[in-house]
Each structure stands twice: as structure tokens, then as C-alpha cells.
A protein has these predicted regions:
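Conserved core of the PLP fold type I
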Residues: 53-168, 183-206
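Walker B catalytic acidic pair
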Residues: 180
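Residue-level marker for buried hydrophobic side chains located in beta-strands
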Residues: 176-177
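N-terminal small-domain helix-loop-helix segment of the aminotransferase-like
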Residues: 2-90, 97
Length: 206
């Protein structure tokens, strides 16, 4: 297994990091997801208030948390129809373990992408398949990852591109997962969620 895992080319990123640091507004380093900004007081207060909770949290989250996530998805992402919510430690954890949990045989992931999509497929002993953006060119698979806005390119998928991925998923009876962890990082184009374009049918869409 170890010999199949990719080596991440940190050295290859060095010249691009130098270019980014020359930007007038500074660089936003998304290479490791390490927080650099002060923790908001709201979060600090919530952590202090919950520090005397001597039990492990319920995996599914409290009803209050589930309702808050659901309302956020409706109001912020434009989600509609019936859908469930599940809190995770972070999107990277889900990316790494979902192919194993779903027992996926073939996993599609963006050809230019954060390495965890490939690593997750390899850990599950699935067949990883790197693809371009056009879903019409994708082969059949049982799990597909979309990443918008993209890390590392920053590219935002259009409505037609996202709808094409949904059509592909329906045709292949596949699970389609859109990693939108950077959805609030729009610049010249405002990112929109895949959930906005399901027309209320969220089956096999994450």
C-alpha cells in the first residue's frame, strides 16, 4: 500500500508560492489548510461554554446542530428538497474515508486536485480515475468527486458544468460528491453549490 501512495511535491510549489507572496493583497496559503487568522470570539466563547461536557459527542450531532446545518444549506447554498446532514471533523477526513465507507470500486476525481482524493481511493483499494471537467467525457464509476472552487486552480464550475455532473451521476447510478470547502472564497466569479441544481432530487448527491 505505501508504495502506491503519491509523494506530494512540496518543493515544486516553492516558485508559485513566491509569486503569490508578491501579490499586493498578500498570499492566501491553501497548501495545508493551516489557520492563520485569529479565532473569532464567537467560537472561543462556544468552546469555553462547552468545556465541561464529560461525554463523547453523538456522531450525528445534536438536533440543534443538525437544524443549524440544514438551515445554512438552504439559505446559503440554495439546497432544496429532502436531504440529511452529518457533521464531520473536516472535509479532508470525509474525502479520505468515503470510498472505503461506500466500498467504491471505481473513483473519479479531478485531474488537477488536492492529493487526498487519490489517497482515499487507494486506501479503499478502489480504481482511481483522474478526469477533466467535462462530465460528458467521464467513464462509468460508482463514486465521483467534484471540487469547486478548485484547489489548487481556484476554478469555479459553471451551472451547466455542475448540471452535467448530476446527469452523469443519474445515468451511471453513481454517488456524486461536490467538495465545496472553499465556496466562500470566490473572487471574480461567485461560486454556487451543486445542491442548488438538483431540482430537489438529492438522491446520491453529497
Amino acid at each position: 500500500m505505501r508504495e502506491k501512495l503519491p509523494d506530494f511535491p512540496w518543493d515544486a510549489l516553492a516558485p508559485y508560492s513566491e509569486i503569490a507572496r508578491q501579490h499586493p493583497d498578500g498570499a492566501i496559503d491553501l497548501s495545508q489548510g493551516t489557520p492563520v487568522d485569529p479565532t473569532p470570539q464567537l467560537i472561543q466563547s462556544a468552546l469555553r461554554e462547552s468545556s465541561n461536557s464529560p461525554r463523547y459527542p453523538v456522531t450525528a450531532g445534536t438536533k440543534e446542530l443538525q437544524e443549524a446545518i440544514r438551515n445554512w444549506a438552504i439559505n446559503h447554498l440554495g439546497a432544496s428538497g429532502d436531504f440529511d446532514v452529518l457533521p464531520v471533523i473536516g472535509s479532508k477526513e470525509l474525502v479520505a474515508w468515503l470510498p472505503t465507507l461506500l466500498q467504491s470500486q471505481k473513483v473519479i476525481y479531478p485531474e488537477i486536485a488536492y492529493p487526498t482524493y487519490l489517497v482515499g481511493a487507494l486506501l479503499a483499494q478502489s480504481e482511481p480515475i483522474a478526469v477533466g471537467i467535462a462530465a460528458a467525457d467521464w467513464p462509468s464509476a460508482d463514486l465521483a468527486w467534484v471540487n469547486t472552487p478548485s484547489n489548487p486552480t481556484g476554478r469555479v464550475h459553471s451551472e451547466s458544468e455542475l448540471r452535467a455532473t448530476i446527469s452523469w451521476a443519474r445515468q451511471n447510478s453513481a454517488t456524486l460528491v461536490c467538495d465545496e470547502c472553499y465556496i466562500d472564497f470566490g473572487d471574480s466569479v461567485a461560486p454556487t453549490s451543486l445542491l442548488k441544481y438538483t431540482d430537489g432530487d438529492n438522491s446520491n448527491i453529497l
